[in-house]
Each structure stands twice: as structure tokens, then as C-alpha cells.
Amino acid sequence: MSDTSELQRFLPKDQELLSGILYRIGYWISHVDDTDEGDRSEQVEHQHLLGCLNKISKAPKAGALLNEMAEESCRQEQSWPRWETKNDSILDDVAAAVSLLKSQGTEDEEKSFAKASMMVGMTVARAFREEPEHAVEHEGYFSWLTEKANDMILAVTDKDAHKDLGVSPEEDNALNDLLAILKS
């Protein structure tokens, strides 16, 4: 973490929420449908989750707060087991994060959070079905990420989209639920 932490402007309990929320979204999507593919699918999805978080943490257009949130999600590996036990409250916690960013963040941070959340969800949902796309990891990456998230937001409104996107119906429903919270 840098010397000037964006997360420090929030209360400790809110820092904990924001530090883990992107990881938790990915974990939740990974476990929303039991594909019976065994540990292999979970390992692939986890690798894609961490890769996506790493890219968000380095994307200048994501903004300093989202960079730090993604970085903390990766860095706090010791917190993963605890975060993974909170799947039942994920949508409530996403709503709390949205509310927190509306009240204490900027409009850009709120938009970046929504786009990053959808991208994490989509990356994990598609992880076991296709090879990772090799996106450029520089300033253009967040533009690419934003475009993909916007495509996803359009796609999840189409009930047949999950077929084209390689997403299971359960994941599609979960992504729709996530989108509804992010748009509220």
C-alpha cells in the first residue's frame, strides 16, 4: 500500500468491507453454480479472479481507491477464508459498499466500483469456459475493462446472453442480481 492510503479516509469497519468486496464478489460468482468439475474449475476461477484484481490494481483509469481496493483484496490472503464464509451476505455487503461510495466517495469512484465489480463477476463466470483474454496491462486496460463491463451490463439484460457469453444460467442470475444492486 502507498503512503497515502485512499482507504484511510473510511472507518476501519468500512475499510474491511471495501478491502474484501471485490474478492468476495468473485468468490461468490465462482460458487453460485456447482458445476461438479471438481477442484480444477475452482482453481481456474480463483486464478482468473486474482489476475483480474491484479489488473484492476494497476489500471490508472480505475482510480486510486479502486486500485487500492483490488490491491488489498490480493494482498490480504490471510483474510480470504474469513471473507469466503460471508457468501450469504454478499449482495447486502455490495449494497453497503455502493451506499458508502455514494456518501463518502466520488461519482467516478462509484462508477469505477460498479464496472470493476461486474468485470470481476464476468471474469470468474467465464473463467472455466474459455482461455483468458490477453489484455494489455497498461493504461488502456481499464478502457478495455470498462468496455467489457459495459458490454456485460447490456448483455445481462438479455436473458439469452449467458449462452453467448459462456455463462451458466445460475451465474447469469447472480450477475443480474449484482447489477441490480450496483444500479440502485
Describe each model-derived feature in a short phrase:
Residues 1-184:
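Acidic, metal/ion-handling microdomains and their immediate structural contexts
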